[in-house]
């Protein structure tokens, strides 16, 4: 049965969530203090502002949270602690408001909608940001969601809330950029060449593409097996992606790829050859310099101690 989203929690749709580095550092510190080396997750409150569909997350704080691993419906979040912390943060910066909550997931869980409903009492349309504190691949370790109402086509069943994914990005003010650069100063390796950086970036992009393709394949397999309902909207998006793929059977395109690959291999070969010649040249110079030092040491007069 087809499902159509007909009503959202707020009149304005969230288009993007911007997370600041201070928030990421605070969440990682929270995880390391509470749930490191365990399967538990940590939960906290996100502070910031929202304007024209963009949620700007500038600060956060942790809240006590417990849940039953066997029964997801059993969980506890300390309301009093949250309200006390928010009042203290409000004194420091009155412009920051509750915009949602965070979790170290690393994926959505069954009781997330219940926790999300709790934050509806503090903000009309809260966002959920899941932070992967132990990412397996490079990239942005954040995923953001907001809730919408969903009803069946025949309207015989009650509407239910579901999460909708929204794009995220990492951004910082000038002061934050200076602090982040200071923290990463000892991490950066200045000896890495630009070519190596570009190759690493392309490799990361290919790994990300491979992961997305695997997710698509897994989703389609679940739909075929009947474990997930058929969603025409997702299939339309997939069809649009496949329609954008180029026809790789064209002779001109195959020839162009071959020429491009041969040119790149030639550049790599010449680079390796030049690097070897330079290394050999430096080795010869080092040998000659050592011989000159040895000759200079041998030509020095040896001091003979005077006899009494």
Swiss-Prot record:
Transmembrane segments: none annotated. Pfam families: JAB, MitMem_reg. GO terms for biological process: innate immune response; leaf morphogenesis. InterPro entries: EIF3F/CSN6-like_C, JAMM/MPN+_dom, MPN, MPN_RPN7_8. Residues 17-154 form the MPN domain. Ubiquitous with highest expression in flowers. Coiled coil: none annotated. This is 26S proteasome non-ATPase regulatory subunit 7 homolog A. It comes from Arabidopsis thaliana.
């Amino acid at each position: 049965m087809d499902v159509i989203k007909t009503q959202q929690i707020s009149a304005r749709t969230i288009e993007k969530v911007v997370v600041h580095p201070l928030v990421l550092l605070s969440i990682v510190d929270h995880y390391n203090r509470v749930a490191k080396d365990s399967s538990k997750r940590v939960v906290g409150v996100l502070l910031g502002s929202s304007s024209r569909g963009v949620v700007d997350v500038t600060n956060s704080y942790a809240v006590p949270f417990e849940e039953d691993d066997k029964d997801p419906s059993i969980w506890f979040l300390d309301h009093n602690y949250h309200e006390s912390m928010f009042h203290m943060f409000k004194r420091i910066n009155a412009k920051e408001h509750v915009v949602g909550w965070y979790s170290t997931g690393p994926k959505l869980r069954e009781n997330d909608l219940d926790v999300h409903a709790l934050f509806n009492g503090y903000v009309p349309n809260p966002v959920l940001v899941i932070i992967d504190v132990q990412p397996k691949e490079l990239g942005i370790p954040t995923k953001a969601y907001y809730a919408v109402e969903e009803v069946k086509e025949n309207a015989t069943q009650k509407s239910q809330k579901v999460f909708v994914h929204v794009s995220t990005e990492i951004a910082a003010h000038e002061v934050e950029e200076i602090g982040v650069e200071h923290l990463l100063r000892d991490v950066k390796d200045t000896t890495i060449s630009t070519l190596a950086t570009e190759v690493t970036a392309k490799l990361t992009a290919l790994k990300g593409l491979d992961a997305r393709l695997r997710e698509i394949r897994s989703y389609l397999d679940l739909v075929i097996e009947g474990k997930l309902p058929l969603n025409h909207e997702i299939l339309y998006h997939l069809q649009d992606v496949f329609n954008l793929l180029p026809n790789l059977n064209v002779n001109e395109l195959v020839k162009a790829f071959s020429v491009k690959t041969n040119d790149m291999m030639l550049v790599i070969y010449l680079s390796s050859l030049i690097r070897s010649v330079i290394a050999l040249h430096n080795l010869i110079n080092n040998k000659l310099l050592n011989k000159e030092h040895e000759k200079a040491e041998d030509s020095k007069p040896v001091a003979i101690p005077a006899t009494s």
